[in-house]
């Protein structure tokens, strides 16, 4: 049996990021063969990763990459469990690898992007960091002039597609989308069910009580018009110059806004609130069963 030297343990720790005792045991099980130890740890890491999948990964980062000729761009969201991990250099390097592969392939299918080496890298990162890590979504915008913007510590990412215009115009519109969060490009894109729901809310407001039906309907029309302007990108006051709308800003730059994608870390993910005492009790119970 080969000796497990401190130097071997250190090398394995450096290569895997695992603790000293775990590395020492792995080397002992592998008779001092570091490559076999790594192979065995990779097998174990798959099990560890699977055990963490029940947790909620609602933190993380978003990232954007746009082609040099602005013909297309991708936006990616990768989740972790905590913002501490979201700032980890290894995590950010993994995110960059995901972006690069999605960008090169113009691929939005997460499973296809993650197939092969990236999934192995994800599992290794889960093992090293100790948190659930998942690639949640990938968006592609292609055609016309595409601009991108990342805001607020990599927590909001935007891609904007213009017809005409320039990279600078697209970037400025993307910055506006990040800051103001419009629902649609223009009022005609607002889903009918959203408009109907807004009408119901307006009808139920106290100042509508006792008014004639025709007056109520006129007030609803006016308030819906205001709602649509506030929610539609092209009708919003441009964030860098509120004296003009986004449509006017784009037109001055020779552009028309065609579409946008806005990703915000964790949006739509429900995070369960667990009582601390109950969580500890659950962990103790689980340990007793194992």
UniProtKB/Swiss-Prot annotation:
Keywords: Cytoplasm, Elongation factor, Protein biosynthesis. SUPFAM superfamilies: Elongation factor Ts (EF-Ts), dimerisation domain, UBA-like. It comes from the Bacteria. Coiled coil: none annotated. Its main location: cytoplasm. CDD domains: UBA_EF-Ts. GO terms for molecular function: translation elongation factor activity. Residues 82-85 are annotated as: Involved in Mg(2+) ion dislocation from EF-Tu. Belongs to the EF-Ts family. HAMAP family: EF_Ts. Associates with the EF-Tu.GDP complex and induces the exchange of GDP to GTP. It remains bound to the aminoacyl-tRNA.EF-Tu.GTP complex up to the GTP hydrolysis stage on the ribosome. This is Elongation factor Ts. It comes from Cellvibrio japonicus (strain Ueda107) (Pseudomonas fluorescens subsp. cellulosa).
């Amino acid at each position: 049996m080969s000796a497990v030297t401190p130097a071997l343990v250190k090398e394995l720790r450096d290569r895997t990021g695992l603790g000293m005792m775990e590395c020492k045991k792995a080397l002992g099980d592998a008779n001092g063969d570091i490559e076999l130890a790594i192979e065995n740890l990779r097998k174990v890491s798959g099990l560890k990763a699977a055990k963490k999948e029940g947790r909620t990964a609602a933190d993380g980062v978003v990232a954007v990459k746009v082609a040099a000729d602005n013909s297309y761009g991708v936006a990616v969201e990768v989740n972790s469990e905590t913002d501490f991990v979201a700032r980890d250099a290894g995590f950010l390097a993994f995110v960059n690898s995901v972006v690069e592969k999605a960008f090169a392939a113009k691929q939005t299918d997460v499973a296809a992007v993650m197939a092969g080496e990236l999934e192995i890298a994800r599992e290794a990162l889960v093992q090293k960091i100790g948190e659930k890590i998942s690639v949640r979504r990938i968006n592609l915008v292609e055609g016309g002039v595409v601009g991108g913007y990342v805001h607020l510590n990599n927590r909001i990412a935007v891609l904007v597609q213009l017809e005409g215009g320039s990279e600078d115009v697209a970037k400025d519109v993307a910055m506006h989308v990040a800051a103001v969060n419009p629902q649609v490009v223009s009022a005609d894109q607002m889903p009918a069910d959203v408009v109907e729901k807004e009408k119901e809310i307006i009808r139920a407001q106290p100042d509508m009580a006792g008014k004639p039906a025709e007056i109520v309907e006129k007030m609803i029309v006016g308030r819906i018009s205001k709602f649509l302007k506030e929610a539609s990108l092209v009708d919003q006051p441009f964030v860098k110059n509120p004296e003009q709308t986004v449509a006017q800003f784009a037109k001055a730059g020779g552009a028309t806004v065609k579409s946008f994608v806005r990703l915000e870390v964790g949006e739509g993910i429900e995070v369960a609130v667990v009582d601390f005492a109950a969580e500890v009790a659950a962990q103790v119970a689980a340990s007793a069963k194992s």
